[in-house]
Amino acid sequence: MAATKHSLADSEDRPTKKTKVDSEEKARLKAEKRERKEKKKSQESEPSAENSDADRAAEKERKKAKKAKKLEKKQKLAEAEASAEPAAEVSDEAPKKSKKEKKTTTTEASSNSEAPSSGSYIQTIALSNVPQAEIDEFLSKNEIHITDPKTENVTLRPVLEFHQLPATNLLEKKPSPFANYKAPTPIQSASWPFTLSGRDVIGVAETGSGKTMAFALPCVEAISALKHKHTKAVVVSPTRELAMQTYEQMASVAALNRMKCVCLYGGASKDDQRNLLNRGADIIVATPGRLKDFMSDGTVDLSHSAFAVLDEADRMLDKGFEEDIKMILSSCPPREKRQTLMFTATWPQSVQTLAATFMVSPVKIAIGSGGKETAGGAVELQANARISQSVEVLEPRGKEFRLLEVLKEHQQGSKKNDRILVFCLYKKEATRIENFLSRKGIRVGGIHGDLRQEQRTRSLEAFKSGQTPVLVATDVAARGLDIPEVKLVINVTFPLTIEDYVHRIGRTGRAGKTGQAITFFTVEDKSHSGSLVNILRGANQPVPEDLLKFGTTVKKKAHDMYGAFFKDVDMNAKSTKITFD
């Protein structure tokens, strides 16, 4: 390799090695510069005698003003009966935080941002100006019973009219989410002040009482402040139809705040639902089974969901979803860091236990004549008093032709297109009844578990539109479905439990309107006679003599095929140790 040549100029440009003389010269120049700087500083710091006195006087005045300011702050704190800790916070010279403390504070702030805003509800002047007598009359008339474990005297007033709600981003949207409503329903009126305050709430109310909007409004309001892109809220429903119906209302409210809502249920394409989830879902409305599937494969993550709703909680427990519900709620943030709402038509021990496990000091709001608690803490089951109930005792073989007679009686003249809901106990029975009525010229549709999801949806839409005014259904449609203007409910076969009877007839007489229910009762249903008599009497309905012949004793719920519907144990009792001799 050839050596590289450098010119003389190049060598002169390169730095040379420093000598001892160069270092001493540099130190001397540095010392002289420091000496000149100190001399100049001392000259500037020598004030005249007059200036010195003036400065001292000004300093004294500043100290006096500072002392007076501190004294004034102390007096204000004393008047407000503040504790010593806030007083320390007001101090002018707050101690500096260490890096560790700053990091802890930042972490706490970020974790708090995951929870929905709480305590933001402020009662409006319009609501405060309502006379207490009017509030008491409203609570009494609608039989609203509110129980708050944190206080004996409930101070939050029910919202009687929409304009009495506090102004928020959602409520100020155009068109208003309440454009089609005249006034809040009782469950909405009583629950909104608590849910908008960030409290956990249990709503015990009949079906068709406006429960969906009761939780839709506070849900969207609460999660609007959350800035992360994960799922912020989850609503769990027992059936596909109820999930779809809830989704429609939730999506319309969420869209006002530009939020995305996704509905998950069985019987539909998983791939299509997964694609929707991958595009982002602020709110998920789902049935327990399908939601659990997506959680298991990692598609859905609820660890940031600060708002959870259990709709028709008692029905989900009846259908065996207890473990699924526990898994879903356990996947959400801890109960102290989320807001949980539960809506149910009944208040059995199983629902009470679920609430105690996953909710924090929930406010219980019960609506209706069955709202008062019994000695055991349960809410007595009663039917909607606006529904006219009649029971016909028949021979088992005569039910189909009697059904045909009833339908022809009610589909005359202006009532030709009135919606009539016919309930059967089994899927095969529903198919047989539907085919029988169709052969007799009745415009009829069906909805039960054997049908594909598209068929069920099509039948339901045809019934809602009036295209087929008669719908034959099993109990899958008995709970939660919002089918407006159902004039008549016919129970061809009595359900397995008296609770299901109440929920079936609850399909009519919704939203403050009246309705009618006709029940065919046979000797095969005699074990339910006592419970049915109690329901009829509780709603001031006539009890036929033929029904009384079966007896009025209320028997424990059991079925030859499905077994017992009860437990002879105290669910709250502590376990005991068994000792053998």
Curated annotation (Swiss-Prot):
User: Which residues form each disulfide bond in the chain?
Assistant: none
Family annotation (Pfam families): DEAD, Helicase_C
Domain Helicase C-terminal: start-end pairs: 402-551
Where along this sequence does the record place binding of ATP? Answer: A205, E206, T207, G208, S209, G210, K211, T212
Where do Basic residues bias regions lie? 63-73
Q: What is its EC number?
A: 3.6.4.13
Read off the SMART domains from this record. Answer: DEXDc, HELICc
Swiss-Prot/TrEMBL GO biological process terms = rRNA processing
InterPro entries, sorted: DEAD/DEAH_box_helicase_dom, Helicase_ATP-bd, Helicase_C-like, P-loop_NTPase, RNA-helicase_DEAD-box_CS
> Which top EC class is named for this enzyme in its record?
hydrolase
Sorted alphabetically, which keywords does the UniProt record give? ATP-binding, Helicase, Hydrolase, Nucleotide-binding, Nucleus, Ribosome biogenesis, RNA-binding, rRNA processing
User: For the motif Q motif, what are the positions?
Assistant: 160-189
Annotated localization: Nucleus, Nucleolus
**Which residues lie within the region annotated Disordered?**
1-118
Q: Which reaction(s) does the protein catalyse, per the Swiss-Prot or TrEMBL entry?
A: ATP + H2O = ADP + phosphate + H(+)
Q: Where is this motif: DEAD box?
A: 311-314
**What GO cellular-component annotations does this UniProt entry give?**
nucleolus
Among Gene3D superfamilies, the record links this protein to:
P-loop containing nucleotide triphosphate hydrolases (3.40.50.300)
Q: Where is the Helicase ATP-binding domain?
A: 192-365
| Molecular function as annotated in GO | ATP binding; ATP hydrolysis activity; RNA binding; RNA helicase activity
Function, in words: ATP-dependent RNA helicase required for 60S ribosomal subunit synthesis. Involved in efficient pre-rRNA processing, predominantly at site A3, which is necessary for the normal formation of 25S and 5.8S rRNAs.
Q: What is known of its domains?
A: The Q motif is unique to and characteristic of the DEAD box family of RNA helicases and controls ATP binding and hydrolysis.
Q: What protein name is recorded for this chain? A: ATP-dependent RNA helicase DBP3
Q: Whose protein is this, by species?
A: Gibberella zeae (strain ATCC MYA-4620 / CBS 123657 / FGSC 9075 / NRRL 31084 / PH-1)
